[in-house]
């Protein structure tokens, strides 16, 4: 006889089966993408995915089309600026940051065109899986993470604005020139633009909006990775509860191992399908965050290690640095490190949870060890269920330790230069 969780699928409506599912998990972040002008999918305000449509023939195109055009223009400006002034780490950093934002925007556009097929493929599998327990609790957790990442994005915007406005006032605005404050700010924060084009307030405001879009976009990518990691972990935990419940069943009511094997195969397919469509975003998320961490480490250690000696006082007395610079760099560095650790730890739980059934399978009595249990054991052991970055790396606890070790090695090398 099938386990109760499997039998409960019978007579359950499609709406109930999809509660706490893939679409409900990612719907709110996608709505945010829609609002900031980079996602051409309509119908996201509905709780059902059947209303989702990719369309450029709508009022929304008035927002989306200029956004893409402006991003493309800024990418070309960044590339020209980099070669016109013979490179430089600041120009290279700005180019890498904008390329990450631009790449995500293009990936979102191409993904939007296939969205209806993707959501149909995923929900087809979800309808064959046992209904998730505590779906309301899972959705509440999802909303909490979305809120936290959105607040983090706004905090990052405010922190950058406060820092750049302060530096503009200190370095680029002379006494009696308060009327040129806004112009000085735009020239200081967007040198790659006004070194090659005449000054324009309109252009400055547009580029500032694009910059805010980039901050929110990159943070929401991290948010989506976290949310889908939680969703897949919940799916695997629910499966693990079914498997471990087998040990407490009597012989006549125990589920057949072949059913558990088939169920694990379905969940494996779900993980692999989601990873196939998500892994470019995972790759961009990690490369963007790690490149920023390395750049900040280089800047901090370069300032602190004059004459191969760490002198914080000299760092603070530098005419181009003050305590606000140190505070800004330290806060931004700490926030990005915390964000990377949060994303990595939660995403690594997918792989860790997928290995849990082995604890039971390795301790089965001889009477229970059959060809089906052996097949399930082999499948669990060799199935690398985890999120990946374009299959270049898989997010596991081992990968997290390796990443930390690499950053520490990078820091030691910088200290020795």
Question: What are these regions, as identified by a protein language model?
Answer:
Residues 2, 17-18, 22-31, 97-120:
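Membrane-cytosol interface segments
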Residues 2-67, 143-153, 157-162, 253-417:
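Terminal membrane-anchoring module of integral membrane proteins
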Residues 62, 68-92, 97, 129-221, ...:
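Helix-loop-helix junctions within predominantly alpha-helical proteins
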Residues 74, 100, 120-127, 234-241, ...:
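Generic structural signal for well-ordered, non-membrane alpha-helices
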Residues 105-126, 226-236, 337-364:
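Inner-leaflet juxtamembrane helices
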Residues 107-112, 131, 135, 244-257, ...:
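Short intracellular "coupling" helices and adjacent cytoplasmic loop segments at the cytosolic face
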Residues 201-212, 216-235, 252-259, 279-282, ...:
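Short, contiguous, pocket-lining structural segments
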């Amino acid at each position: 006889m099938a386990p109760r969780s499997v039998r409960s699928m019978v007579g359950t409506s499609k709406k109930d089966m999809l509660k706490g599912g893939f679409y409900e998990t990612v719907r709110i972040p996608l709505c945010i993408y829609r609002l900031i002008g980079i996602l051409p999918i309509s119908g996201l305000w509905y709780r059902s995915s059947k209303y989702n449509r990719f369309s450029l023939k709508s009022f929304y195109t008035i927002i989306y089309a200029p956004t893409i055009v402006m991003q493309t223009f800024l990418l070309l400006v960044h590339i020209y600026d980099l070669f016109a002034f013979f490179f430089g780490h600041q120009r290279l950093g700005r180019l890498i940051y904008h390329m990450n934002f631009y790449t995500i925007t293009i990936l979102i556009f191409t993904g939007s065109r296939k969205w209806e097929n993707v959501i149909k493929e995923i929900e087809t599998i979800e309808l064959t899986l046992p209904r998730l327990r505590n779906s309301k609790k899972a959705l509440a957790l999802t909303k909490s993470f979305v809120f936290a990442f959105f607040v983090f994005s706004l905090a990052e915007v405010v922190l950058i604005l406060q820092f750049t406005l302060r530096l503009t006032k200190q370095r680029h605005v002379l006494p009696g020139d308060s009327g040129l404050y806004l112009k000085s700010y735009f020239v200081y924060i967007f040198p790659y633009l006004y070194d090659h084009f005449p000054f324009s307030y309109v252009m400055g405001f547009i580029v500032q909006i694009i910059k805010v879009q980039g901050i929110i976009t990159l943070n929401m990518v991290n948010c989506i990775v976290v949310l889908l990691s939680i969703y897949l972990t919940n799916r695997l935990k629910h499966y693990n509860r079914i498997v471990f419940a087998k040990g407490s069943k009597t012989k006549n009511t125990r589920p057949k191992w072949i059913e558990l094997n088939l169920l694990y195969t379905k969940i494996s397919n779900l993980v692999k399908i989601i990873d196939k469509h998500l892994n470019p975003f995972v790759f961009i998320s990690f490369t963007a965050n790690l490149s920023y961490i390395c750049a900040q480490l280089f800047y901090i250690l370069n300032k602190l290690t004059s004459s191969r000696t760490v002198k914080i006082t000299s760092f603070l007395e530098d005419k181009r640095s003050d305590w606000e610079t140190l505070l800004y760099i330290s806060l931004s560095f700490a926030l990005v490190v915390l964000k990377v650790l949060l994303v990595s730890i939660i995403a690594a739980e997918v792989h860790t949870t997928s290995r849990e059934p082995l604890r039971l399978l390795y301790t089965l009595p001889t009477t229970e060890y059959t060809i089906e249990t052996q097949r399930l054991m082999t499948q669990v052991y060799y199935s690398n269920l985890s999120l990946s970055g374009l299959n270049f790396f898989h997010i596991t606890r081992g990968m997290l330790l390796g990443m930390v070790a690499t950053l520490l090695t990078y820091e030691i090398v910088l200290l020795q230069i």
